[in-house]
């Protein structure tokens, strides 16, 4: 995709903090690697609602799975993070229909399985400082 190669260098200058809400550790570690390689600071990886609310703190954005260790709590976690901290939300799920009413600051959804370019495009979309964020066919804008 033209222009996709410039996303990491733009992101790298920003050092935004990210919370990863994902109960599949290999998926979470893949997200962490992609985001950290692009210059983001991953604040934490959490696997359920209790961990998310006790660990979250003020983060700039969150990548949130829908079905977690404690059930389909992702949408509620996303709403809480958006309301309490103003976090921009990117849902990461195999079934976007389960999102229901998106969180106030939800910007998009990425279908699993995902690729690195989709994650970087979604991160740029979730960053209010990215005026020229590049879209990606695997990112569903909300």
Predicted segments with their positions:
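Non-catalytic signal-transmission and effector/linker regions of two-component phosphorelay proteins
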Residues: 1-17, 111, 115-142
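Acidic, metal-coordinating helix/loop segments flanking the phosphotransfer/catalytic sites
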Residues: 2, 45-61, 69
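Conserved acidic carboxylate
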Residues: 22, 93
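Two-component/phosphorelay signaling modules centered on CheY-like receiver
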Residues: 25-44
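Conserved phosphotransfer microenvironments
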Residues: 64-82
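His-Asp phosphorelay/catalytic-motif detector in bacterial-type signaling
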Residues: 84-90
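As written
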Residues: 101-111
